[in-house]
């Protein structure tokens, strides 16, 4: 069991022993450090707060700067919380966290925010088929059709699929295989795609199975 915070670098392809091309994602997982240790007696739950990267102090507001200095670490770019059962180590504030908690071939879950696509219609957002392309119709090709009932129920049901903001949601991709670990450069190569654009931050957690 292990967990760490990482930044998505991009995608590439690697070849396995069978000379098959495998799509992979490169993640920069570190340098990470513990910024706070939360205890059930004081905070109501047990967790580790993890930071990643080193940021110029001039670009950090005073409350966050004080938070980092209390832990005795340099300001980072991102902070995220992990439960103690996910990290499965005894750590103190200021302690470093690296890729030694993982091994090649291990399965992980990656949590991130998907790419935001803005306001989208029902054809793009929910894969609707649209209206008929015949009988002189001109403006019903990508329309949703009827969304309500008649006099009974006289309303549109909550949760009806309609146009709206698409993307920008919390996504978890499960059971991705670690292809390669490069501890000297804090790089992690995983099989397949992970959520979010380049340079977005993700949480990496070992699968519980």
Curated annotation (Swiss-Prot):
Signal peptide: none annotated. One of its GO terms (cellular component) is cytosolic large ribosomal subunit. The keyword RNA-binding applies. Keywords: Ribonucleoprotein, Ribosomal protein, RNA-binding, rRNA-binding. One of its GO terms (biological process) is translation. Residues 128-163 are annotated as: Disordered. It holds the Pfam family Ribosomal_L3. GO terms for molecular function: rRNA binding; structural constituent of ribosome. PROSITE patterns: RIBOSOMAL_L3. InterPro entries: Ribosomal_uL3, Ribosomal_uL3_bac/org-type, Ribosomal_uL3_CS, Transl_B-barrel_sf. The keyword Lyase does not apply. One of the primary rRNA binding proteins, it binds directly near the 3'-end of the 23S rRNA, where it nucleates assembly of the 50S subunit. PANTHER family: 50S RIBOSOMAL PROTEIN L3, LARGE RIBOSOMAL SUBUNIT PROTEIN UL3C. Belongs to the universal ribosomal protein uL3 family. Part of the 50S ribosomal subunit. Forms a cluster with proteins L14 and L19. This is Large ribosomal subunit protein uL3.
């Amino acid at each position: 069991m292990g967990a760490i915070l990482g930044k998505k670098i991009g995608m590439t392809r690697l070849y396995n022993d069978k000379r098959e091309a495998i799509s992979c994602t490169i993640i920069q997982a570190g340098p990470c450090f513990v910024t706070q240790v939360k205890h059930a007696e004081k905070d109501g739950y047990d967790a580790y707060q993890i930071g990643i990267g080193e940021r110029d102090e001039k670009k950090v507001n005073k409350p966050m700067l004080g938070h980092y200095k209390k832990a005795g670490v340099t300001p980072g770019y991102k902070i995220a919380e992990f439960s103690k059962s996910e990290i499965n180590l005894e750590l103190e504030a200021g302690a470093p966290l690296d890729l030694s908690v993982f091994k090649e071939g291990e399965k992980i879950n990656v949590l991130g925010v998907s790419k935001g696509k803005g306001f989208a219609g029902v054809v793009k957002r929910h894969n609707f088929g649209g209206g008929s392309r015949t009988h002189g119709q001109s403006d019903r090709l990508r329309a949703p059709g009827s969304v309500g009932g008649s006099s009974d129920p006289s309303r549109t049901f909550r949760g009806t699929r309609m146009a709206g903001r698409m993307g920008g949601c919390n996504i978890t991709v499960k059971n991705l295989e670690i292809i390669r670990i490069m501890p000297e450069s804090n790089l992690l190569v995983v099989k397949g795609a992970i959520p979010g654009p380049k340079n977005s931050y993700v949480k990496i957690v070992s699968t519980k199975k």
